[in-house]
Amino acid sequence: VTQLYGDRMMIANATGCSSIWGASAPSIPYTCNHEGKGPSWANSLFEDNAEYGFGMYTAVKQIRNKIVDAMTELVSMDICEDAKAVFTEWLDSRNDGEASKVASAKVVELLEKPACDCTDEKAKELVKAIKDRKDYLVKRSQWILGGDGWAYDIGYGGLDHVLASGEDVNVLVFDTEVYSNT
């Protein structure tokens, strides 16, 4: 899974067996690519991992919504057409993992150079708001991992809530058939 989504993957892992075989020093399977980017991994209490992972997802979603608001306002302002095109491309592709990576690189490049010397104070404020959140431009792939004991018993209520939300999260249950918690 990390080979498919690694550089934009966020993992919430239920405490237990998978924490041991999936994140014990000195041999941790989560690595970085040539850009120094890789999955983020954190674990929570055994019983609340679904809620924990959902909270991670919701926090990122809120931050990205602030980026959307800033870019939407900038596009409606009197700024250079190049900037409008870059922001519009990101707005159109922000919910597609791979396309958002391409568009995000263009946004970061634009933000790093004084291409469109903004003199408008509101525009400067909005550009700063985007710069401050640039690590959230690429769409994250949120994963919630846990074992059969977690998913079918103590964590079921939270997991049911998360799945019923219809939000874009992924759940991987390690069904060992020996009720191995996580």
Protein language model regions, located:
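Thiamine diphosphate
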Residues: S18-G22, T31, A123, I130-T182
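Terminal amphipathic helices with adjacent charged low-complexity linkers/tails
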Residues: T15, S19-F46
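N-terminal leader/propeptide and maturation segments of large enzyme subunits in energy/redox metabolism
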Residues: L45-K122
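Carboxylate/His-rich catalytic cores and anion/metal-binding grooves
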Residues: M10-I20, P26, Q62, D69-A70, ...
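Long, compositionally biased charged/polar accessory segments in the mid-to-C-terminal portions
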Residues: L4-R8
